[in-house]
Amino acid sequence: MIDSRHDKYLHSVPGLPGVAGVLVSNEKDFVFTSNRGEKTVGVFPYGREEKLEKVRVGGFPNGLAFDPSRDALLAANVSKQDDPTPVTVSMVETKKKILTADIIVPGRTRWTVFDSKMNRFYVNVSTPPKIVAIESKDPDGIAASYDIPATGPHGLDIDTENRRLFCACDQGGLFTVDLESARVSRVSDLSGPPDVIFYNSRLHHLYVAIGDPGMIDVFDTDTMKLSQTVKTEVGAHTIAYNPEIGRVYAFLPASHRAAIYQEV
C-alpha cells in the first residue's frame, strides 16, 4: 500500500495468494483483489485490511470491475494451459459476499471495465480477439460482442462521456470501439506489447504501460496521436492511476520501486 498524498510506502497486505489485480471503489470505500493463486476475490473496507473476506469464484481471477449501484463485482477469470474447463467471468455480490453468476466466455480474458451509463461490463477476450459485454442487472450471458482485428486484446478502459472504449492489443495496436455505432477502429501503433491502460478524463490522455522496452505511451485522446513516451524500466507492465490527484504509478520489478509521474 502507498500513501498517494505523501508518496510513501506503508505496508503490504498478506494472505492474497497470486494477487493479480486490485480495484478501489471510492463510492463504497472498499478494496477488491483478484487472488489468482486460489480462485478467490478479496473484499475489505478501505484502511481495514484486517477485515478481509474472500469469495470463491469460477476460475483464476485477473481483471476486476465494479458496479457500485448494485454492489456487483465482476472478476474476469483465466484458466491454466490445456485446461478443458470453459473460461468464465464471475459476478460477486459484495455486500453479501456471495457468487451470484458464472458466465462462460469465448476464451481467456484480460482486463474489464464498467460502463455506468449503460450498466454494462466490458471484458477483453484474448483469443478469439474480441470484447464482450455483460449486463450488470441481469448477467445471464453475453449481451453483445465486438470483434477486434488484432492478436490479444489486453488493456481496456472507457471514455464514458464520448461513448467509446480504448483497447490495447498484444500485437502492438491501439483500437477504439464506438459504443453507439459498434465501429472498431485501429488508431495507432504502440511502442511494444501493452498491459494495463488508464484514461485521464480531465486531460483527455490515455496511459499505456509497455513492459518491453519499459515505457508508458501517452496519447492525446482528442486526436488519438502519441503525445509522449515516458521511460520506466524493462518489465514494468503494471501501472496504477489516481484520478483525484492526477498521478500515475509505475511498478518497477527489477529495482523494487514505484515510480511516480504527475501531469499538470
Task: Locate predicted features.
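Predominantly soluble domains enriched in secretory-pathway, periplasmic, or organellar proteins
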Residues: M1-V264
